[in-house]
């Protein structure tokens, strides 16, 4: 199974980018993992927040395939423990999911079109974090899930 983290905008923080890259490097031992960046549409434009969400939404939908198993990372989504998330990924792997896409929207969230197209949502926390931090947290959780599934001593209960 290939896991894609589809994100809007690049990471400005070198520290966050380096930490995320470290987990991506570690993940290569377990699963194909890729971060796909949609260019930030607000640069050089004067769009309203709704127009920006719509523009980002069109870009997100254009990158999704009909066969993808897609999940929005959204504060209103279902919360999982690390053990539950690892079981969720394992189920996807065992049911033959070829490409699993997790999407982090832009600063104003997801457009109505994206929300209608993608039913599954996961929340990493009820708290609000920067999108750059969510990239790191999510990548670490995927790595943690892989170590749980492989019975490796990274996660402690």
From Swiss-Prot:
E.C. code: 2.1.1.177
Catalyzed chemical reaction(s): pseudouridine(1915) in 23S rRNA + S-adenosyl-L-methionine = N(3)-methylpseudouridine(1915) in 23S rRNA + S-adenosyl-L-homocysteine + H(+)
Protein's UniProt keywords contain Cell membrane: no
GO cellular component entries: cytoplasm
Predominant place of localization: cytoplasm
Localization, UniProt: Cytoplasm
Signal sequence bounds: none
GO molecular function, one term: rRNA (pseudouridine-N3-)-methyltransferase activity
Keyword rRNA processing belongs to the record: yes
Keywords annotated in UniProt: Cytoplasm, Methyltransferase, rRNA processing, S-adenosyl-L-methionine, Transferase
Function, as annotated: Specifically methylates the pseudouridine at position 1915 (m3Psi1915) in 23S rRNA.
NCBIfam families attached to this UniProt entry: PRK00103.2-4
The family this protein is said to belong to: Belongs to the RNA methyltransferase RlmH family.
Assembly with partners or alone: Homodimer.
Protein known as: Ribosomal RNA large subunit methyltransferase H
Organism: Porphyromonas gingivalis (strain ATCC 33277 / DSM 20709 / CIP 103683 / JCM 12257 / NCTC 11834 / 2561)
